[in-house]
Amino acid sequence: MPTSNNYFHLHLVSDSTGETLITVARAVAAQYANVTPVEHVYPLVRSQKQLDRVLDEIEEAPGIVLFTLLEKDLVSRLEDKCKGINVPSLSIIGPVMQLFEAYLGAATTGRVGAQHVLNAEYFKRIDALNYTMIHDDGQHVEGLDDADVVLVGVSRTSKTPTSIYLANRGIRTANVPLVPGIPVPVQLETLTRPLVVSLHATPERLIQVRQNRLLSMGADSSSDTYTDRQSVAEEVAFARKLSAKHDWPLLDVTRRSIEETAAAIMKLYSDRQRNRPSE
């Protein structure tokens, strides 16, 4: 149970990188706003000796234990130990694997870290990341036609983090800022191959994010047009008008996380690819 300080220990044990565990655990923990998890992440646990060290730490700071282990001996040892010290434990991939086995009629290969092998998909992600970093914030617009997705929007609409998230999914993503008074690159206006998505937010949200940004930099925002209500509203109106002119789909990111924004873009991209005539 959480302590009087409203925190609890969350142990994440993996025989690979632990990314799957972290993603699932944080998604669930976010639903409990009144308690804060203290994460203990143990990646690359592949031997009894490594697991024993993990079990010692779990015993010292009892809490919820989530794991992704494929080696049956390690799973049994972990579950037995947790049961012995009255600590809840759960395999995140176990139930999913059982479902796959029941449907496919075949057992798993049991390959640890199989999702991280250096295959074509891995190198596709690396290529996408390289492209995205080079084409961030309106840089090298001559290469925009090589993108899968181009994000546009005014300042602080999460263009860069969303671009990086998409690149991690193997989608070559560029982003271009929309600024009133500054001409849009000709290359952007003539694109036909990439999907162009316009990211938007309410003026109130943009002002809040921009003020926080300036505060973190130690700058004074009291007389800055960057956070002036009228100026920001004009920016938003300009971006909307430009997007309508070019028929770019609008995506409101006001209340969306980066992950939610990226998911919406990936759906647009998938739909577009599916409906595109074969070349």
Swiss-Prot record:
Cleavable signal peptide: none
Pfam families: Kinase-PPPase
Known catalytic reactions: N(tele)-phospho-L-histidyl/L-threonyl-[pyruvate, phosphate dikinase] + ADP = N(tele)-phospho-L-histidyl/O-phospho-L-threonyl-[pyruvate, phosphate dikinase] + AMP + H(+); N(tele)-phospho-L-histidyl/O-phospho-L-threonyl-[pyruvate, phosphate dikinase] + phosphate + H(+) = N(tele)-phospho-L-histidyl/L-threonyl-[pyruvate, phosphate dikinase] + diphosphate
InterPro entries (alphabetical): Kinase-pyrophosphorylase, PPDK_reg
Record EC number: 2.7.11.32, 2.7.4.27
UniProt enzyme class: transferase
Chain positions recorded as ADP binding sites: 153-160
Keywords, alphabetical: Kinase, Nucleotide-binding, Serine/threonine-protein kinase, Transferase
Gene Ontology MF annotations: ADP binding; ATP binding; phosphotransferase activity, phosphate group as acceptor; protein serine/threonine kinase activity
Keyword Transferase included in the entry's annotation: yes
Family of the protein in this entry: Belongs to the pyruvate, phosphate/water dikinase regulatory protein family. PDRP subfamily.
Stated role: Bifunctional serine/threonine kinase and phosphorylase involved in the regulation of the pyruvate, phosphate dikinase (PPDK) by catalyzing its phosphorylation/dephosphorylation.
Identification of the protein by name: Putative pyruvate, phosphate dikinase regulatory protein
Species this protein is from: Bradyrhizobium diazoefficiens (strain JCM 10833 / BCRC 13528 / IAM 13628 / NBRC 14792 / USDA 110)
